[in-house]
C-alpha cells in the first residue's frame, strides 16, 4: 500500500462487562482503500467497529486515526476527525424533511478526501430527489438508509464505515446501495464494509480481514480470497 494508513489498530482488546470480545486485533486502512471485514455472526465485527469509533469504553490497545492517537477518544471526537458511520439502523431525523436532514449533516469548511455537496448527493440518490420535501418518517426503510448514507457523505468524510448497511432491505434497494458504495470507493474515500453478502464485499474491496472469535485469522487481497477454501471454512459457506 503506497498511501499512509489513515486508520490503524494495534493489539486491540474489548470487553462487554466480563465478556472478553476482541483479542489483540491488528487492522490498517490506507487512504482511498476499501477494506472488507468478514466473519460469521457473533465473531466481533460490530464490536470492533464500535471500538474503533469510541463507543466501547472497556478497551485496550492503540488506535490511531489520521496520525492521532484516539485510543481513549469519545465518539464525537472520532467523528470530527473525518469518520462517517452508517449502521444497520436508519440514522435519520424522522420529523425533518429529506432536505433538512442533509443540510444538518453538512460540515461547512471541512475539506475531506472528496467533495459531496448537496447537489451531488441528489444526483447520487434520484429516489431522495423525488422525495426532497418528505419527512424522514414518510420514507421507506430503504429510502431512510439511502438518506443515512447521504447524510454521511455530506460530512465530507475521509473514511466511511458501513456496518450491515443493506441488512433487511429489498433487492432493488440493495443493488442501489452497492452502486453508491462503488461511487464512494471511486471518489477516493476510504471505506470499511461489513455485510452478509461476502462475495459482494470482496468484489468492492481492495483487501479483506476475517474475524473468528474476536481475532484476525485471515487477511489478504480481496479478489484472491474470493475462492479461498480457508475463507469458506471460516465463513461456513
Where is each model-derived feature located?
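The feature captures the beta-strand-to-loop junction immediately N-terminal to the Walker
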Residues: 38-40
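ABC-type ATPase nucleotide-binding domains, specifically the catalytic core motifs of the NBD
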Residues: 17, 57, 73, 96-116, ...
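ABC ATPase C-loop
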Residues: 152-153
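Helix-to-loop junction immediately C-terminal to a conserved catalytic motif
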Residues: 53
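Conserved ABC transporter NBD signature motif
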Residues: 61-68, 81, 114-118, 220
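Walker B catalytic motif
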Residues: 164-165
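Conserved ABC ATPase signature
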Residues: 135-139, 143
